Structures are given as C-alpha cells and as structure tokens.
Curated annotation (Swiss-Prot):
Membrane topology according to the record: Peripheral membrane protein
Renumbered ranges of motif Twin CX3C motif: 24-48
Organism: Caenorhabditis elegans
Gene Ontology molecular function terms on file: metal ion binding
Protein name: Mitochondrial import inner membrane translocase subunit Tim9
Compartments where found: Mitochondrion inner membrane
Cystine pairings recorded for this chain: C24-C48, C28-C44
Length: 90
C-alpha cells in the first residue's frame, strides 16, 4: 500500500469515526447540566457503538459472500465458454 493510500485509508477511518461519534452523541446526550457522563448516557453510547460495529461486521460479511458468489459465477461462465476446459494462463 502506498503512502497516499495509507493517508486516504486513515482519512476514511477518521470520517467514519467522527460520524459514529456524532450520531451516538446526538442520540445519547440530552442534558448538559453536569460535566460528568451519566450512567444512562454511557450505557446508551456503548450500545450505539456496539450496534454500529455489529452492523459493519454484518455488511462486510454479506459483501464477502456476494464477492464469492460473483467469483463462482464468473468461474462457471468461463468453464462454459471454454467448453468445460480450463486453460492454464502462462
């Protein structure tokens, strides 16, 4: 991975992190009467992050399954195209 790709990957991570932090904060913090985080707010934020992580994991898993199915379908199409013979590429 090049330096530019690393920087872009890090930027994408920070963007996603900030979006999740903002969403969870807006959903969970409703009162600003104290500097401390209440137990309810902390629990809500933990649940919010947990849901996001599970959703991300599930989407990633489905994407991998989709990619595998596409690869298998493409492999079957190549076999049919070649009359069932697989030609070795050199």
């Amino acid at each position: 991975m090049t330096s530019e790709q690393n920087i872009q990957t890090f930027r994408d991570f920070l963007t996603q992190y900030n979006l999740v932090a903002e969403q969870c904060f807006n959903s969970c913090v409703n009162e600003f009467g104290s500097r401390t985080v209440s137990g309810k707010e902390e629990s809500c934020a933990n649940n919010c992050l947990d849901k996001f992580l599970k959703m991300t994991q599930r989407v990633s898993q489905r994407f991998q399954e989709h990619q595998l199915l596409n690869a298998q379908a493409n492999g079957a199409a190549i076999k049919v195209e070649n009359g069932g013979k697989i030609n070795k590429i050199q």
